[in-house]
Amino acid sequence: MMDTITNCTADVTIERENGGHAIGGLCGYAGTHSNPDICLETEGFSTKNYPSVIDNCNVTVNIKANGATHVGGLVGTGLYYYGEETVFKITNCSVKGSIDGAVTPGTVAGRAEGSTIESCTADVTIDENAGTEQVGTTTQMYESADQ
């Protein structure tokens, strides 16, 4: 079963003084693992609690996350578990605002490996201190030296 967030509006301010991971205007983690039973059997939690579909949401964000990785206007990242990234789908959403201090920021998602983002708009200012060579990366789990 896919959990869904639809037709929502949010005005979010998030402040993180030092470090962190998976920070998003709607949710830090999103997605469905191909085998959620692995998560239940091994660690006692299920990834079905994370939204798999985010549709028709409008979010204004002001995120200050000094040194944090995978910071996004809507979603921080998929849940990386047992060598596999969970996947999610974001459609018909808009995000505006600012992200300051993040090492690996993204206007919609901080990391979206294997996921789908369609028909979305973003007007998000990312400060000059971001690791701009990593903006939009899908190649590494943690890019910060602090992690």
Show which residues each predicted segment covers:
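Surface-exposed loop/turn motifs in large extracellular/passenger domains
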Residues: 1-105, 109-147
